[in-house]
Regions:
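N-terminal Rossmann NAD(P)H-binding glycine-rich loop of SDR-like oxidoreductase domains
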Residues: 13, 17-22
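Conserved glycine-rich Rossmann-like NAD(P)H-binding loop of the short-chain dehydrogenase/reductase
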Residues: 27-42
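Rossmann-fold cofactor-recognition segment
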Residues: 48-64
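Hydrophobic positions on the long internal alpha-helix
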Residues: 84, 119-123, 127, 173-174
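Catalytic loop of short-chain dehydrogenase/reductase
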Residues: 89, 93-108, 128, 132-182
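C-terminal helical subdomain
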Residues: 168, 179, 183, 190-219
Length: 219
């Protein structure tokens, strides 16, 4: 009998983690959804079919918490086939330079960038035990400098300094890791899960076309 592939999805405030987890379940993955704080509480209350995957409370800014998650994966599965770095936070909507608080910027970077680096460092040995390991870092068009300098782009005038720069940094980090991992079997790439049709941050959902693109990455 073929062993199921094992995936970890990280989740914070954008609500997409459960969507990714369900897609993976439908494609015969064993899934661990690592969620923090309010997200964990909300997901815990849903019950029912939710628990087809393992829900694990995680502080992505804590090495101790991530080490506990790694221990769970090691003891239960002994490997990791897919890591989806989806956890993110956003603040500072519409803020001008005088309104930016450095502590708020640091908070965003802790989850959106530093946690990604930390979890890849920690989980790399587990990924190396997979036959075809893959890492998908969830990014955003707001971190795409080419798009943000295009006045025709619907988000071009958004002032989200912490979030946008954290995603731009994530894009560069992923590019550098792609070069580093190229000689190995680990595949790493960015993926933007949100279709930008209505120009609003209030509706975070995966459209059918985007969903198909995501499925193509996990097969």
């Amino acid at each position: 009998m073929k062993t199921k592939r094992v995936a970890v999805v990280t989740e914070a405030g954008n609500g997409l983690g459960k969507t990714f987890a369900n897609i993976l379940l439908n494609h015969e993955y064993e899934v661990i959804l690592a969620a923090s704080k309010k997200s964990f509480e909300n997901l815990s209350q849903e019950g029912g079919a939710l628990h087809d995957y393992k829900l694990f409370k995680t502080d992505f800014t804590s090495l101790e918490s991530l080490t506990e998650l790694k221990s769970l994966i090691t003891s239960k599965f002994g490997k990791l086939d897919l890591l989806i770095n989806n956890a993110e936070i956003a603040n500072g909507f519409g803020q001008k330079i005088e309104q930016i608080r450095i502590e708020d910027v640091k908070q965003v970077y802790e989850t959106n960038l530093f946690a990604v680096i930390r979890i890849i460092q920690l989980f790399k040995p587990l990924l190396e035990k997979s036959d075809a390991p893959s890492i998908i870092n969830m990014t955003s068009a707001l971190g795409d400098i080419d798009k943000m300098t295009d006045e025709n782009f619907c988000y071009a005038n958004y002032c989200m300094t912490a979030y946008a720069t954290s995603k731009a940094a994530l894009n560069m980090f992923t590019h550098l890791q792609c070069k580093e991992f190229k000689p190995s079997k680990i595949n790493i790439q960015n993926f933007d899960p949100v279709a930008l049709k209505n120009c609003t941050h209030n509706s975070v959902s995966i459209k059918d076309g985007i969903k198909d693109d995501f499925i193509a990455l996990i097969k």
